[in-house]
Amino acid sequence: GFGIFDKKAKKFEWRREFEGFTLKYPIRALFCASDGTIWMATDGDGLVHLDPATDRSERYTTENGLTSDAIISVHEDIEGRIWFTTEEGLFWLDPERRTIISANDLLGIEGSIFNPNAAWLHPDGHLSFGTSQGILTFNPAELDYFNKVDIKLILNDLSLNYNSITADPE
């Protein structure tokens, strides 16, 4: 579960019940994001996002595209993307798009076992994650995924059911 201490009321509340789900597994890591929301890496309930200001919560699991519901660590980069590790590698979530993307191929990660709650954001924007093979450090801004070039698409021909379709010249 998750404990919350209300300073004004001087009360401690232990929570396992969230909006639409109940935590059944321990929390491995907590991270307070720059927007004041809390990210919880659980041992089998996926990645949980809680907004303490509104008490709204959401959960990312294998049903949303995760490769595992066992999240090992979680951290945020300087662009607000949430990075987390599972038994299957390193991933990030773009909070605006709610899209989960694997960083394994981009970083050449193979067979690394990530350590619980072992993530760090360096002042220069680099992220580090502790693994069984040492420390993995990289700068998310330098990944090819984020350095997209606008490409103009030109179609010479388009076929629909083996029939060529011509575009209006304008």
Feature locations, PLM:
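Residue-level "micro-hotspots" composed of small/polar
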Residues: F5, E19-F31, D43-D45, L50, ...
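Short beta-strand->loop
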Residues: R16
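Sequence-structural signature of mature extracellular/luminal beta-sheet repeat domains
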Residues: G1-K8, A29, D35-I38
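Catalytic-site microenvironment of enzymes
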Residues: T54
